[in-house]
Amino acid sequence: MAGAGPRPATLRTAFAIAWPASLAAIITPVLGLIDIAVLGRGADAVALAGASLGGAVISVLYWSFGFLRMSLSGLSAQALGSKDEVQLRAYLLQGLGIGFTVGFVILILASPIIAAGHMLLVETSEASEDAGRAMETYLRVRLLAAPAVIATTAVLGWLTGQGRTGLLMAITTAIAVINACLSVLFVLRMDQGIAGLAAATALAEVAGLALGGLAVLWVTHQRGGIRRHWSLARARMGLGATMSLNRDIFIRTFLIDIVLLSFARLGAGFGDLTVAANHVLLNLILSVTLLLDGPAIAAETFVGQASGARQNKAALFDAAWRETAKIIAAEALFLFLCLAVFSSAVLRVIVGDGPDSSVVIAEAQRFMPWAIFMPLAVAAAYQLDGVFIGATRADKLRDTMAMSALVFGAVAALSMPLIGNHGLWMALLIFMLMRGALLLHAWPVVKAAVLGHSVGMPPSRAAQDLPK
């Protein structure tokens, strides 16, 4: 209902928000494997290579704009906490404006983006020119849906900030299922090859925007009516501060990209076998820790609503912190135990039974202890990312990420000459620990500042940027 304020965070309510978000995080990559299976049965190895290369470009491009989901989540949660329906909808208008603008810029710059992808992934690698042409075909079709993809990201952030992670899961699942069905139709039945695969995904992404629009209509109907509480003037007035928030989250995300790319690049110095082992273990870590996204999103929601609340802020903050920490700690411990017990079996499943699989598995097992402890190392960073996003203090996320990245570089430089690839893994583990430790150190000061300031902005900007 329109006047509803923030819900107190309990273990039950936090889990109710966290589990659909966790499932949404893992549904897309799991069902995305269907695309590879379909193309493997309906096209040749060149098409499969082109789809893999194109998918890598798309992943980096779209993931870089994930800041829009995070910023809209924190901002909408704060507006909900303050019971400001006009501001809540103004943030959606801002997000859609930014999303469509960025999406159309990507569409306009499609040719330079494709050329850059070709240069980085084909010209400097062993990939064939045929695979490069297949990648270009794939990207030209996929990028047509860029405005829909980025705008949908904004819609999903707006919904998650209100705790509507059930809708997040439903939309994400629908996109994946539509994609899988259209892939089977276009590739296996109509024999359209890589262009058909790309078209299936692009159409599914457009359908996702349509479903997101229906979700917005449903939620606004529940919160006072579809036609009420919209204000373009309010959306324009706060746009500068929203852009600053998005900038800081983008920088934070870019720094993570730099660290992960540096990890891959530094590992290449140890030879092909170590590169393969590092690739397997890193992708395993990134996949299993997706489950931690759910509690992090719950933290965004409850901390954001506590930030916007006009009464009992301190109690709401403490409850949000405490209950989401319980869930993320339990999930991290569960993932740690699963990796510790089933690591050998998991490696056999991932690597398969190819001609070099046994040596790759043996090499990966040498460094598996680092991967086993990674869920525990990253848990605090995940939860505190959600806490700081909910408090819309992305400036601290940016600064602590920069310091953590410098620590990663220093540890890698000092340890790799002494202990080789183990030093690289130690640097990554310390990077994850530093993220959490630095955010934990910054939190008391940020909490004290945010409790006394206005909705949705860092305290230094609240008084001048928010509409009165």
Go through each PLM region and give its residues.
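Alpha-helical transmembrane segments of multipass membrane proteins
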Residues: 33-36, 154-158, 180-185, 213, ...
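Hydrophobic alpha-helix feature that most strongly marks membrane-spanning transmembrane helices
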Residues: 255-259, 263, 268-272, 289-296, ...
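Helix-loop interface residues and adjacent transmembrane-helix termini in multi-pass membrane transporters
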Residues: 33, 42-45, 79-82, 161-162, ...
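Small-residue-rich hydrophobic transmembrane alpha-helices
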Residues: 48-108, 152-161, 165-168, 277-341, ...
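Transmembrane helix-bundle signature of multi-pass secondary active exporters and lipid flippases
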Residues: 19-74, 145-149, 240-305, 331-335, ...
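Membrane-helix interface/capping residues of multi-pass secondary transporters
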Residues: 36, 45-48, 85, 165, ...
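Short runs within selected transmembrane alpha-helices of multi-pass transporters and secretion channels
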Residues: 66-70, 141-160, 168-176, 197-213, ...
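Short alpha-helical transmembrane segments in multi-pass integral membrane proteins
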Residues: 1-21, 76-147, 178-181, 187-247, ...
